A protein has these predicted regions:
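Ser/Thr-rich, low-complexity intrinsically disordered terminal regions
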Residues: 2-136
């Protein structure tokens, strides 16, 4: 890991079907945040489509093909990956949780206050790539 990787947070994982809440800093997005009370942290969940198992498998393939992604945990419909930046090695913690027709997501920077929209852009890029894979 790079110089600015930080420590892995202790609040990762799903508890009673819920991922950890975002802190007040703007460097986190989550599909389980209330979109009306906290729109700056809210991002829509990924669509699991008509076959959630196929979508989950596609998500895992997509992550495996992405540079600087380390899948740390993949069990029982929960996946946790670390994404690192190429230059300074900043690490973001990204979680995916299967929930029927949705895949809930949480993406948060370990260090700093602002992420300049990187976490939101990452989830939207994954959403776009999954949709493209599903249409093939």
């Amino acid at each position: 890991m790079g110089l600015f990787s930080g420590s892995r947070p202790g609040n990762l994982g799903a508890v009673d079907g819920m991922l950890a809440r975002c802190k007040t800093s703007p460097n986190c997005v989550s599909s389980q945040t209330d979109q009306h009370q906290d729109p700056s942290h809210y991002v829509e969940p990924l669509q699991a489509g008509s076959d959630p198992h196929l979508t989950w498998a596609a998500l895992k393939r997509l992550l495996a093909d992405m540079p600087r992604v380390n899948v740390v945990s993949d069990r029982d419909g929960y996946l946790y990956a670390e994404f690192s930046t190429p230059l300074m090695g900043f690490v973001d913690d990204v979680e995916f949780l299967q929930a029927g027709e949705f895949i809930h997501v949480r993406s948060a920077s370990r260090l700093g206050r602002s992420d300049f929209g990187v976490n939101r852009a990452r989830i939207e890029a994954i959403r776009t790539q999954l949709a493209a894979m599903a249409s093939k």
